[in-house]
Design a protein with these regions (language model features):
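Active-site mouth loops of central-metabolism enzymes
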Residues: 80-98, 143-164
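Gly/Ser/Thr-rich loops at beta-strand to alpha-helix junctions
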Residues: 112-113, 118-123, 146, 186, ...
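Histidine/acidic residue-rich metal-binding segments in metalloenzymes
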Residues: 126, 158-264
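N-terminal metal-binding scaffold of metallo-dependent hydrolase/deaminase domains
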Residues: 1-40, 44-48
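Metal-associated gating/positioning segment near the N- to mid-region
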Residues: 45-130
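Hydrophobic faces of well-ordered beta-strands that scaffold small-molecule active sites
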Residues: 53-57, 114-116, 139-144, 177-181, ...
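Divalent metal-coordination and catalytic microenvironments
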Residues: 9, 25, 30, 47, ...
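Catalytic or ion-translocation cores adjacent to nucleophile or general acid/base/metal-coordination motifs
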Residues: 105-107, 134-148, 168-175
């Protein structure tokens, strides 16, 4: 049984009403407890802030896009190198560090939980392998659905239950936290060398629009009673004015579609 006593901690925890109190924190098996035995490991935190770990709710540290960055910049692995020290693995990479490099750097900033912003379902296994190689943080991921044909079929049929079944099965299969739409329908157009210029422009080869995809996804997630508060980060009409060109939406971006209803 692993026990730790953090002594003389300058604790800041507003949720618990603690605003800079000096106190000892007993920990057993990774959980704060009332007391520990006299044989515990003692850490003197005097002179240091002690506060709950940070949560980065949108990061890109694992998965296909990160690895493409590594493929395209092999010279980057010569930068950011650190040797192995004790239990710490060697690291490399500055622009796109290795998983261990990401983990150690986040730890230095006080982060203990990371949400990978976009996990491709077909590459979910490798994404989770990278999670396992990120030793200092709890990891979770939003799952990409913006080009999912099964979801498109449900949207075209206006069938919320079918959409919920697709989303629920996929999240369960890939162990995803929430759903992620990045340029819904636009990625389908890119496959044919085309693009979408508006939220109501039809998706090529489908009798649906990006608005339909977003609306159906929101309704399906509410139907599933996905936990946590409703957090919509929707940037669907971001326009860029370039001299001589009309306004054009740059990206349809919907992250972490969840509901404020409790899980059942």
């Amino acid at each position: 049984m692993h026990e730790i006593l953090i002594k003389n901690a300058f604790v800041i925890d507003p949720v618990q009403g603690i605003h800079g109190d000096i106190m000892d924190i007993p920990i057993r098996e990774g959980r704060i407890v009332d007391k520990v035995s006299g044989n515990c490991e003692v850490i003197d935190a005097g002179g240091n802030l002690t506060l709950p770990g940070g949560i980065d709710s949108h990061t890109h540290v694992c998965g296909t896009k990160v690895n493409f960055g590594r493929y395209m910049s092999p010279e980057d692995m010569r930068a950011g190198r650190t040797p192995r020290r004790g239990a710490m693995y060697p690291t490399s990479g500055y622009t796109v560090p290795t998983t261990y490099g990401n983990s150690y750097r986040y730890s230095r900033m006080g982060y203990t939980t990371l949400l990978e912003g976009a996990m491709a379902p077909l590459e979910a296994r490798h994404t989770h392998e990278e999670f396992a190689a990120t030793p200092m943080q709890d990891m979770l991921a939003n799952t990409l659905f913006d080009g999912n044909w099964s979801l498109f079929e449900a949207v075209a049929d206006k069938d919320i239950r079918q959409a919920a079944a697709v989303i629920g099965w996929t999240l369960s299969a890939v162990r995803g936290f929430g759903i992620k739409l990045t340029n819904p329908g636009g990625t389908e157009a890119w496959g044919f060398g085309d693009d979408l210029s508006g939220i109501d422009e039809p998706v090529p080869n489908w009798d649906i629009t990006p608005r339909d995809i977003i609306d159906t996804s929101i309704n399906a997630c509410e139907f599933l009673h996905l936990p946590t508060r409703c957090i919509f980060t929707v940037t669907i009409l971001v326009c860029l004015e370039i001299t001589g060109l009309p306004f054009r939406p740059l990206i349809f971006h919907l992250i972490s579609i969840q509901t404020d209803r409790p899980s059942t």
